[in-house]
Structure formats: structure tokens, C-alpha cells
Amino acid sequence: PTEETSQEPLVDIQPQEPEAPPEPTPEELAAQEVEDLLASLTLEEKVGQLFFVRVPDTDAVSDVSTYHLGGYILFGRDTADKTADALIQTIQSYQDAAAVDTGIPLLIGVDEEGGTVVRVSSNPHLRASKFPSPQKAYASGGMEAVLADTREKDFLLSALGFNVNLSPVADVSTNPADFMYDRTFGQDAAATADYVAQVVSQMAEDGMGSVLKHFPGYGNNVDTHTGIAVDQRPLESF
């Protein structure tokens, strides 16, 4: 007799290649870059990065690396009588010092609110006329005019090397007698909040950093540059 042997069909099992990990997203790559950069800094360098200071009268370039500064704020004395090329070169010299020191670009800020506080457009070499106050811009064409004015500021400041405008003023004032009134939107809290939100969004779109001021709010208080203010408003009103 013949024995028949039944066999299971052969199965060809190939080793499977392990799945490649997913490519990191741009956000993940950026986060890792930040972590690596942070890990490379000394404690002293990390502390220096917390300081966003006024440009000193002397040693402005060397101070960037001496103190590992996070940023410089330019005031009227730093922009007065300078041509655009001269100001660009000055700001670039600060950035060059930061690049050699920590490799982290500086925040370069200025107060260019429009109206009474115009550290850049007050110099006729940098702009033919001063930027208008928020109230004047609004009176000339509503929020459309305000946002057009914001864009023009952002483009001018960016071209000169600034990346932060210490603006907009978020204080609420409806009384022309208030110290802060001329620098504010001049309307109630709801209208001011809407104005601030739209301006900040426009600045972000233009790549310009914004700073809301003044905390916790001037209201109708006196000028704290020259004295001490005591706010007498009840908490509910505040």
C-alpha cells in the first residue's frame, strides 16, 4: 500500500521592514530647536535674555554680549537726526553682537504709538510726517483707516530693523482732561477692547510684536512719570 502524506501548503513569510517613524512637523522641529538652544545656554545667559532694556549712552554694542541681553528699546535720543541707513546700521550692529554671543536675535523695540509718542516718525529723515494718534486715524476713516495706519507703521519699523512696537495703548479714557486721553482710543471699554484686538491682529499679520500698555490702566490718574498715582475708583468700576 502507498502511504499518502498530506502536507500543509507552504507559506512564504518575508521579514517585514519596520515602519519608519513619521516625519516631524515644522512645529515639532521648531520646538526641538528651541529646546536645544535653551540647553546650550548658561544660567547667566538665560538671565540676560530676560532683560529688554534701554540702549545705554555708551558701550551699547559690547553690552549686548557682556550681559547677554534679550532686547534693546530705542528712545528719541537714539533715533533723532539719524538717516534711515544710519539707524539700520546701528540696529544691525546690535543684532550682530547678539549673533556672536548667544545666537538669539534681539528684540528691538520702540514706542511708535502715533500722536504725542512717536520716537521714529518725529524724525523727518525717517518719515515726512508724524503718524497720527489713534483717535485722529479713526476720525479720518474708522477702523479701516486705523488698520491702514498700523500697517504703514509696521512696514516702516520693520524696514528699519525694529521687531516690536510698544503699542497699542489699551488704557480706557473718555475724558479729554485725563492725562492719558490723547494717547488712547478715546472710547469706552468695549470699543477700546475691539480696537486693541484688531490692531494686535494686524501687527501679528505684519510680523510686528505688540505690547499692550499700561498695566493695570491709567484711567483718569495723573502722570506717573512725574509723581505717584493713587486710584480712587471702586473695585467694580475698575
Regions found by a protein language model. Name each.
Residues 2-36:
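N-terminal, intrinsically disordered, polar/charged segments of Gram-positive cell-envelope systems
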Residues 195-198, 202-206, 212:
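Metal-dependent enolase-superfamily TIM-barrel catalytic cores that perform enediolate-based chemistry
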Residues 25-89, 118:
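DNA-contacting surface of Y-family translesion DNA polymerases
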Residues 63-192, 214, 219-235:
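Enzymes and membrane/adaptor proteins characterized by extended Gly/Ser/Thr/Asp/Glu-rich
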Residues 47-48, 102-105, 206-208:
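Short coil/turn connectors at secondary-structure junctions
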Residues 238:
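Glycine-rich anion/phosphate-binding loop at the beta-strand->alpha-helix junction
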